[in-house]
Amino acid sequence: MIESQRHSYHLVDPSPWPISGSLGALATTVGGVMYMHPFQGGATLLSLGLIFLLYTMFVWWRDVLRESTLEGHHTKVVQLGLRYGSILFIVSEVMFLFAFFWASSHSSLAPTVEIGGIWPPKGIGVLDPWEIPFLNTPILLSSGAAVTWAHHAILAGKEKRAVYALVATVSLAIVFTGFQGMEYYQAPPTISDSIYGSTFYLATGFHGFHVIIGTLFSIICGIRQYLGHLTKEHHVGFEAAAWYWHFVDVVRLFLFVSIYWWGGI
């Protein structure tokens, strides 16, 4: 496949990974339901499904890297399609988190009789937003600045500087995750403490999960940059990871204002 390709099709070799990923997701879902209810063998099926799903993700992305780096299949048209796909994926995640913000706003603006007609509900301890949550916010935003630094370094052809910037990104992300764990350990409410606890842990936990995923993306990009896979002409994988990381940064700002600060008043 050459750069002068005139059609927009993303032609790849036949792959077993879509069907294996579907089977892994099915086993994970069924195993999760069996484990929660609980049925015998649920934990085993859940574990096997997760292992199978993670293995499929690893080998599938490995094949994508081979197609782009070694085989030259990712032409400019294909790269454009991958960028569109990344944007649509991030939009779907925005909708997911929007549901949690909606639930929190709906519950706080119109508290029901069951929780005493006040927000936060009477008797529920709340987290001080000006302690760990406030400290964690600039830490995560700084990691976003480091990603931007890495992007400019790649565009300038400065490979070592890009690696250093990605190391800084990952380090700050790990610090953020550690503080998030401390926050959960010290937080007064539990996830079963009325709608307040449920929306608090769903929103912050889902965001924390995204931070972990983004950290893994940044680690992979750092390794690929060190190996010389990323150039100023071809770095779609890094761009997708950077967009994802900036999305996580923006969500953190909304979380701090609406969940930690305003929602905890």
UniProtKB/Swiss-Prot annotation:
Pfam families linked: COX3
Entry annotated with the keyword Mitochondrion: yes
Membrane disposition: Multi-pass membrane protein
Gene3D superfamilies attached to this UniProt entry: 1.10.287.70, Cytochrome c oxidase, subunit III, four-helix bundle
Transmembrane segments: 16-36, 41-61, 84-104, 137-157, 162-182, 200-220, 245-265
Origin superkingdom: Eukaryota
UniProt cross-references to InterPro entries, sorted A to Z: Cyt_c/ubiquinol_Oxase_su3 (IPR024791), Cyt_c_oxase_su3_dom (IPR033945), Cyt_c_oxidase-like_su3 (IPR000298), Cyt_c_oxidase_su3-like_sf (IPR035973), Cyt_c_oxidase_su3_a-hlx (IPR013833)
EC top class named in words: translocase
Compartmental location: Mitochondrion inner membrane
Function: Component of the cytochrome c oxidase, the last enzyme in the mitochondrial electron transport chain which drives oxidative phosphorylation. The respiratory chain contains 3 multisubunit complexes succinate dehydrogenase (complex II, CII), ubiquinol-cytochrome c oxidoreductase (cytochrome b-c1 complex, complex III, CIII) and cytochrome c oxidase (complex IV, CIV), that cooperate to transfer electrons derived from NADH and succinate to molecular oxygen, creating an electrochemical gradient over the inner membrane that drives transmembrane transport and the ATP synthase.
Record protein name field: Cytochrome c oxidase subunit 3
Gene: COX3
